From Swiss-Prot:
CDD domains: EF-G (cd01886), EFG_III (cd16262), EFG_mtEFG1_IV (cd01434), EFG_mtEFG_C (cd03713), EFG_mtEFG_II (cd04088). It is found in: Cytoplasm. This is Elongation factor G. The lineage of its organism: Bacteria, Pseudomonadati, Pseudomonadota, Alphaproteobacteria, Hyphomicrobiales. Belongs to the TRAFAC class translation factor GTPase superfamily. Classic translation factor GTPase family. EF-G/EF-2 subfamily. It comes from Brucella ovis (strain ATCC 25840 / 63/290 / NCTC 10512).
Length: 694
């Protein structure tokens, strides 16, 4: 079977937004207008197509990014293939967003016309910057009370530091919102609001003519800056044609120089079709973005893989899901080459072979078996044994490791135990499966108490995982109170000279190390050797590093992992017979334990960036409450009729905050929080923690 759509006609994109900006409704509309969905599912009915896990439908939030393939005929009459990845907008699931962005070529950022740029929008935007993803912005919910398109455009500049390029203006707002002015064609597009109705094209309302001219002029000025020839022509008085203008906007969007801004209301069916046209016209095909980089396994040098069916096969596994009908599904993006059912591929990260048995094309919760897939496709593979998120699968003859994804460490832990003996074994299987799906979820055993500890990115994250264990794996579990994932570090430099000697008949053990331990700004561990003259032979130096790393996981104060330590090996001694890598490992372990005490060990706690959006009446109570939680208020600002309070608060003091805020504001205030940084714990609090964990 040959390729049905040219790779130039693919658009791999995602929709990213703050929770409640209308992302799931927008995806539903896109699926409806592109003909994949016959009945629109509304999020508030719990019937949405993309949100296919039970909890998502209950909670009305999107948790897992389902990938969907659909098609759209552009303005030029040509059909394009869309692969849409739905991403969650809740802070506890930023990891999902991160991995979706990693495999997308472009994205639509949705804004709520009333709230503008919200905290999660900033987080997701920053993640997209990291991967240099071309983005458009759609100002949604223009029919909502307090909708303000121009304020949202201003916030894209002031809050996101991005260059906003409005290509449409709204006609009316709130209940009077009827359509948009297309600044490229200089026509008015209006909709009567019935599902699936095309736009009525007409003249721009007289009272908007001047504004439209002014914004079109700004649009052209920004667009011609992208291309020297267009700029020269413009300065000589030649205006670009509409098609030339679209080409310039496309070029600038793909180069991430600016972001086209459109508007509408997905719920009321106004503005969806022009957005789909804009995906075709402004967002990149896989061939428009730089070729993916990787490491050639044979030569260990950097290499690239072009988006072409002729290139050697390479693909990145970006998500693992348990499907109730198919079992474990691995979602992968094919970057180069052609994939055929039945072939064996190399997992270069694990050094294992995987056979491709069953291949599926996913529509949100229905699936279609396929035998072939090509560069640019996103496929679901059933039955892979060794592959986890972030692994590369490729042609065994041309092995490559594509750029890995980075996942943050969890900030919250809870103890969990099975309710019955029968649940014991099932719980182990369930937790391992969930951890394979979600790299930001960790499972470990507490050696002293024998308890199983699960760790994640927030209370909601762990709630949902425990809930899934119950539903999908039928495991009943008792859950402890949440614990903060504290860390330890050192505050000053300390030099330790330690000798490890053991003689008990036969060959003994001997190693002497002289190490300087000092704090550094990062969170990682840095090891350096300044040995000259062979006082410690080269082959023993890795043992010194390994020894220190093996005890970094349990600091001297309360047994928490250590952060931000630099160790420099400056001297030592060895014995021809009695020294070994193991002896140096033991010596450096003991040196570190002694050094951590002498270097002024301190406890660190995670500090969360908290944003509370509250009606004016409750601002005083909210600020007072955050102060009582050891919070530092960093400022307040107006947002529509509400006030936004920004603060930095220790995670330890934020447990159960959702209920306090609800009762304080009669359910009218909302908050978001995300991990920001680690900070030393105040002495009195640190003593309490040490007592508890010592």
């Amino acid at each position: 079977m040959a390729r049905e759509y040219k790779i130039e006609d693919y658009r791999n994109f995602g929709i990213m937004a703050h929770i409640d900006a209308g992302k799931t409704t927008m995806t539903e509309r896109i699926l409806f207008y592109t003909g994949k969905n016959h009945k629109i599912g509304e999020t508030h009915d719990g019937a949405s197509t993309m949100d296919w896990m039970e909890q998502e439908q209950e909670r009305g939030i999107t948790i897992t990014s389902a990938a969907t393939t659909t098609f759209w005929q552009g303005r030029d009459g040509k059909k394009r293939r869309f692969n849409i990845i739905d991403t969650p907008g809740h802070v506890d699931f930023t990891i999902e967003v991160e991995r979706s962005l990693r495999v997308l070529d472009g994205a639509i950022a949705l804004l709520d016309a009333n709230a503008g740029v919200e905290p999660q929008t900033e987080t997701v935007w920053r993640q997209a910057e990291k991967y240099h993803v071309p983005r458009m912005v759609f100002v949604n919910k223009m029919d909502k009370i307090g909708a303000d398109f121009y304020r949202s455009v201003e916030m894209v500049g002031s809050r996101l530091g991005a260059v906003a390029l409005p290509v449409q203006l709204p006609i009316g707002a709130e209940n009077d919102f009827v359509g948009v002015v297309d600044l490229i064609e200089m026509k008015a597009l209006t909709w009567d609001g019935t599902i699936g109705a095309p736009a009525t094209v007409g003249e721009i309302p007289a009272d908007m003519a001047d504004k439209a001219e002014e914004y079109r002029e700004k649009l052209i000025e920004l667009a011609v800056e992208i291309d020297e020839a267009a700029m020269e022509a413009y300065l000589e008085g030649t205006m670009p044609t509409n098609d030339e203008l679209r080409a310039l906007i496309r070029k600038g969007t793909i180069e991430v120089k600016f972001h086209p801004i459109l508007c509408g209301t997905a719920f009321k069916n106004r503005g969806v079709q022009p957005l789909l046209d804009a995906v075709v016209e402004f967002l990149p095909a896989p061939t428009d973005v730089p070729a993916i980089k990787g490491i050639d396994v044979k030569t260990e040098t950097e290499t690239t893989r072009e988006s072409s069916d002729e290139a050697p096969l390479s693909m990145l596994a970006f998500k693992i899901m348990n499907d109730p009908f198919v079992g474990s599904l691995t979602f992968a993006r094919i970057y180069s080459g052609k994939l055929t059912k039945g072939v064996s591929l190399e997992n270069t990260v694990k050094g294992k072979r995987e056979r491709i048995g069953r291949m599926l094309q996913m529509h949100s919760n229905s699936r279609e078996d396929i035998d072939e897939a090509f560069a640019g496709d996103i496929v679901a593979l059933a039955g892979l044994k060794e592959t986890t998120t972030g692994d590369t699968l490729c042609d065994p003859l041309k092995p490559v490791i594509l750029e890995r994804m980075e996942f943050p460490d969890p900030v919250i832990e809870i103890a969990i135990e099975p309710k019955t003996k029968a649940d014991q074994e099932k719980m182990g299987i369930a937790l391992n499966r969930l951890a394979a799906e979600d790299p930001s979820f960790r499972v470990k055993s507490d050696e002293e108490s024998g308890q199983t500890i699960i760790a994640g990115m927030g209370e909601l994250h762990l709630d949902i995982l425990v809930d899934r264990m119950k539903r999908e794996f039928k495991v009943e579990a008792n859950v402890g109170a949440p614990q903060v994932a504290y860390r330890e570090s050192i505050t000053r430099a300390a030099e330790i000279d330690y000798t490890h000697k053991k003689q008990s008949g036969g060959s003994g053990q001997f190693a002497r190390v002289k190490i300087i331990f000092e704090p550094h700004d990062g969170d990682d561990f840095i090891f350096e050797s300044k040995i000259v003259g062979g006082s410690v032979p080269k082959e023993y130096i890795p043992g010194v590093q390994k020894g220190i790393e093996s005890v970094m996981g349990a600091g001297p104060l309360a047994g928490f992992p250590m952060l931000g330590v630099k160790a420099t090996l400056i001297d030592g001694a060895y014995h021809d017979v009695d020294s070994s890598v193991l002896a140096f490992e033991i010596a450096s372990r003991a040196a570190f334990r002694e050094g951590a005490q002498k270097a002024g060990a301190q406890l660190l706690e995670p500090i969360m960036k908290v944003e509370v959006v509250t009606p004016e009446d409750y601002v005083g109570d909210v600020i007072g409450d955050l102060n009582s939680r050891r919070g530092q208020i960093s400022g307040t600002e107006g947002r529509g009729i509400a006030t936004v309070v920004n603060a930095m608060v220790p995670l330890a003091n934020m447990f159960g905050y959702v209920n306090s805020l609800r009762s304080m504001s009669q359910g009218r205030a909302q908050y978001t929080m995300q991990f920001d940084h680690y900070e030393p714990v105040p002495t009195a609090v640190a003593q309490e923690i040490q007592k508890k964990f010592a």
